[in-house]
Amino acid sequence: EIGLAFDGDGDRLGVVTKDGEIIYPDRQLMLFAADVLGRCPGQPIIYDVKCTRRLAPWIREHGGEPLMWKTGHALVKAKLKETGAPLAGEMSGHVFFKERWFGFDDGLYAGARLLEILARAVDANTVLKALPDSSSTPELNIAMQEGEPLALIDELRRQAHFEGAREIITIDGLRVEY
């Protein structure tokens, strides 16, 4: 028992457990990555900067190379093509399968792949609940003029003190990992 939801044009997947728990796209990517890497070990798996910090270690643990990239459908799709990665995804729910598919985002296909993975389990709910969960700051958008975003990020890097930060990432905006 699982709930699958699709956006209006069918290119994004939403997942809800039988208990009503939302399985956010970065957690969906964990299942997809483990499955794909079983057939394509050592390959890069692309994810956008909005995904939580739990995804990269999961990809490594399952034999892949995590590759964080900029947010945006076209940007992720271009990176998939550039790298030849078998899988990419965004926190928005866009999942791009190159392995056994055509390299574009298709929510219905992603749903079918998820059902294929879960069909191998005795209890799908147990599989979904076992995925590591994490909290993250939602995307913050500030209205700005052309050129201002990069200047703001530079200024934040100069003036802000991110006490205890493990890493500061500026691939697309500002991401601080602790």
What are these regions (language model features)?
Residues 1-16:
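N-terminal small/polar loop signature for handling phosphorylated ligands or for N-terminal nucleophile
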Residues 6-8, 22-27, 101-106:
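Short glycine/threonine-rich catalytic loop with a Thr-x-Gly-x-Asp
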Residues 8, 20, 28, 50, ...:
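Short, ordered loop/turn segments at secondary-structure junctions
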Residues 10, 22, 91, 95:
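Gly/Ser/Thr-rich beta-alpha loop segments that engage phosphate groups in nucleotides
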Residues 12-29, 55-56:
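Short Gly/Thr/Asp-enriched flexible loops that form oxyanion-binding sites at enzyme active sites
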Residues 26-44:
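Ser/Thr/Gly-rich flexible loops in soluble cytosolic domains mediating phosphotransfer, phosphorylation
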Residues 38-178:
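Phosphate-binding and adjacent anionic-ligand microenvironments
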